[in-house]
Design a protein with these regions (language model features):
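A structural signal for the main folded, soluble domain(s) of proteins
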Residues: 20, 192-195, 202
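Residues that scaffold the ATP/ADP-binding catalytic core of kinase and kinase-like folds
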Residues: 73, 168, 198
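GST-like fold's C-terminal all-alpha helical module
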Residues: 93-191
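Glycine-rich, flexible loop/turn motifs
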Residues: 40-43, 81, 141-142, 147, ...
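Acidic/histidine-enriched, glycine/proline-rich intrinsically disordered or flexible terminal extensions
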Residues: 202-216
Length: 216
């Protein structure tokens, strides 16, 4: 095996890491360790003190504990797919869009999802998030995916966060005419085999457990 992946099924950061790993790696390349966030395993804390998933511990001893870096590592293992998912002429623009997702949009998303913990109400944070969502909607108006008619790294990196936003109030999101293309884009990922392959449920990892191979 190439290493160990500490993951949490519903975390959008972990989701996007798993998406890239499933696409790029041969089956059974990694050991998957499902983490319970309220009881994180000491083995993970020892290698990544920031204590967030995902964490990839490579056989060489290298630790990669940022999801986007895990995605890029996965792509480096499959250079042919990397050329398809990260077209050179879109590389900088894709990086900027992913950074906006991980920055301002994620800030608003967290507060929208847990508005009772913050200063303003749900609608306030939903409105804050809408600028980014409308930017995605515009991109999808004349093409199937965010940068062209084929999936790129940006789609894989951003989709789990749009999914999380939509699920805060699914009925409201699906009724919004302003997000028609975004709804279709999201539905395609949610209904696809790739997403199903990364969302299998696993028991929380314990040291005495038999290793779970990933991708399956």
């Amino acid at each position: 095996m190439l290493g160990i992946l500490y993951s949490f099924r519903r975390c959008p950061y972990a989701m996007r890491a798993r998406l890239a790993l499933v696409l790029c790696l041969p089956k059974a390349s990694l050991e998957l360790r499902e983490v319970v966030l309220k009881n994180k395993p000491q083995a993970m804390l020892d290698i990544s003190p920031k204590a967030t998933v995902p964490v990839l511990q490579l056989e060489s001893g290298e630790i990669i504990d940022e999801s986007i870096d895990i995605m890029h590592w996965a792509l480096d293992q499959n250079l042919q797919l990397k050329e398809e998912l990260v077209p050179l002429h879109f590389k900088d623009e894709m990086k900027d869009l992913i950074s906006e997702n991980d920055g301002d949009f994620k800030w608003a998303l967290d507060r929208y999802k847990y508005s009772d913990r913050f200063e303003h109400n749900e609608e306030y944070y939903r409105e804050k998030a809408s600028a980014f969502l409308l930017k995605l909607e515009i991109r999808l108006t004349n093409q199937k995916y965010l940068f062209s008619d084929v999936v790129t790294l940006a789609d894989l990196a951003i989709f789990p966060f749009v999914r999380q936003f939509a699920h805060v109030n699914k009925a409201w999101f699906e009724q919004q005419g302003q997000y028609k293309q975004l709804n279709d884009w999201l539905a395609e990922f949610l209904e696809g085999d790739l997403f199903a392959s990364i969302m299998k449920k696993y028991s929380a990892w314990l040291p005495e457990h038999t290793a779970t191979q990933f991708p399956e």
